[in-house]
Amino acid sequence: AGRPFATTLVGDASLSARPMERIAEPLRQMGACIETTDGHAPLTVGGGSTPLSGITYRLPVASAQVKSAVLLAGLSARGSTTVVEPVATRDHTERMLELPVLHVGAERHTTVDGNTRLRARQWIVPRDVSAAAFFVVAASIAEHAIIEMHGVGLNPTRTAALDVLRAMGARVAIVGEREVGGEPIGDLRVEAPE
C-alpha cells in the first residue's frame, strides 16, 4: 500500500480462506486502493501517486495481523498513524520496530511516524513456542522423556501454553534467556514427571 506500483498477493489454501476485508478496510481509510476476491486472497493493492494518510484506527476485534498491517502502512504515510487496541494482541511488530506503546487504562495505543525509512538489517526469527508446545506435551507424558529445544521465542504474549502445562505438573525449565531482535528467547528443557 502506498507504493507507485500494483501488487497482487496470493496465498495457499489456508491463507486464501482467511478474511482479508478486516485488513483491507483500515488501509482503504488511509487511501490505499485494495480489491479482494470475495473478501479473501488473492487481493490486489493498486499503485497510485497519492501517498497514504495517517489515521487513528481502533481495532474492532483483537487482531495482531490488522494492527501490524496498519502500523507498517503507517511508516510510509503522511503524518502519524495510531492503532488503539481495546484488548492487547501479540506485540512482535512493536518490538521489531522498537515502537513505544502507551497504556491508557486497559487500552494500548501504538503510534508510528509517517515517511519513516527502514534500515536494512539482519534478523533472527525465534522458533515458534506455539509449535514447540506439542513437543512439550509429548515429553511431559512420555515416561523417562527429556527434550531440549534451543532458541525458542518466549514473547509473553505467546507463552500461556507453557504456563498451563507447568500448572498441570509439566517440568519445563527455561535456560539461557536472552533477547534477539527485541524478542525474548531461551532454551527449553522438558522432562517427564517422576
Where are the regions a protein language model picked out?
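Structural preference for solvent-exposed beta-strand-turn elements
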Residues: 1-194
